[in-house]
């Protein structure tokens, strides 16, 4: 595990008067003037958010652009597992902290509560639903007195992002080693992208069912992240010797696989590929990619249309 965090430096930051916006962002008022980057993305992406932000107490948070740091806290699996949780709860640092958690996040990812219970003292945890009404809490915002968090001390935003990913990989690899019995990988897994309900409009691969039918003949199993709890998905990926998956939040499950396995991403030919390619490279997976084509033409599909994977994988 130490190999993943070699040559990178982190500092444990303590914040006071933290406002948490569930499903959006955590905004921080640092107690230190150190200009370390808490970047999971560049500051410029959030200018509009910061300029429109207001809270009940002017002392709660600075609205000056350069003084505010943030981290994604979306219930999207990638943002939670890579950009948020390991930075908040790595190495058992927050057992005595008071923190308020949106219960909807735990409900959405069955099994996550048990994982967090190893790193947090739940006697100090307050749970809340999406609608909140409390003193010093505005609608949909949670107020926390203190919070500790790891941040990269790299002043370069891109390198800080890489540092965060290395820390996250190390965190989850350590978790898997401590909580799952050693096993020689044997499964072949296909991770689909959910097309149920409102997510139907976000379908990317137009022939994923057809792809899986072909892969079944090669002994692949289906992993639908919306149909199994988190620990089941973890176990399946930990036992996998090969993973094929459609680009989307479900591919975050490669974090739980063992280094060196084969991983093939099905995606558009654009920068989206880099999200999971970078994780795969950190983990030293045998990375492959198959770019989606237009349905009736052998040219690359654009993000505005469904892509189709043709030929064998």
Regions inferred by a protein language model and the residue ranges of each:
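The feature primarily captures lumenal catalytic ectodomains
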Residues: 1-313
């Amino acid at each position: 595990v130490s190999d993943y965090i070699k040559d990178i430096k982190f500092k444990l930051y303590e914040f006071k008067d933290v406002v948490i916006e569930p499903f959006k962002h955590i905004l921080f008022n640092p107690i230190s003037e150190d200009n370390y980057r808490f970047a999971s993305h560049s500051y410029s992406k959030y200018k509009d958010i910061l300029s429109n932000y207001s809270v009940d107490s002017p002392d709660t948070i600075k609205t000056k652009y350069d003084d505010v740091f943030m981290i994604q806290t979306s219930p999207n699996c990638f943002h939670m597992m890579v950009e948020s949780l390991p930075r908040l709860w790595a190495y058992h640092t927050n057992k005595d902290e008071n923190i308020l958690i949106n219960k909807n996040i735990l409900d959405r990812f069955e099994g996550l509560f048990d994982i967090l219970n190893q790193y947090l003292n739940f006697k100090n945890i307050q749970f809340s639903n999406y609608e909140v009404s409390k003193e010093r809490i505005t609608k949909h915002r949670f107020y926390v007195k203190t919070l500790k968090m790891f941040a990269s001390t790299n002043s370069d935003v891109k390198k800080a992002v890489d540092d965060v990913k290395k820390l996250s990989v190390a965190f989850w690899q350590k978790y898997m080693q401590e909580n799952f019995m050693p096993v020689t990988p044997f499964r072949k897994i296909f991770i689909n992208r959910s097309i149920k309900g409102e997510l139907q409009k976000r379908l990317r691969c137009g022939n994923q069912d057809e792809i899986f039918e072909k892969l079944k003949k090669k002994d692949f199993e289906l992993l639908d992240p919306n149909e199994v709890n988190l620990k089941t998905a973890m176990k399946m990926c930990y036992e996998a010797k090969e993973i094929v998956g459609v680009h989307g939040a479900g591919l975050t499950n490669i974090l739980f696989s063992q280094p060196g396995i084969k991983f093939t991403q099905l995606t558009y030919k654009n920068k989206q590929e880099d999200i999971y390619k970078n994780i795969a490279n950190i983990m030293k997976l045998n990375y492959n990619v198959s770019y989606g084509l237009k349905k009736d033409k052998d040219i690359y599909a654009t993000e505005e249309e469904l892509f189709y994977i043709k030929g064998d994988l």
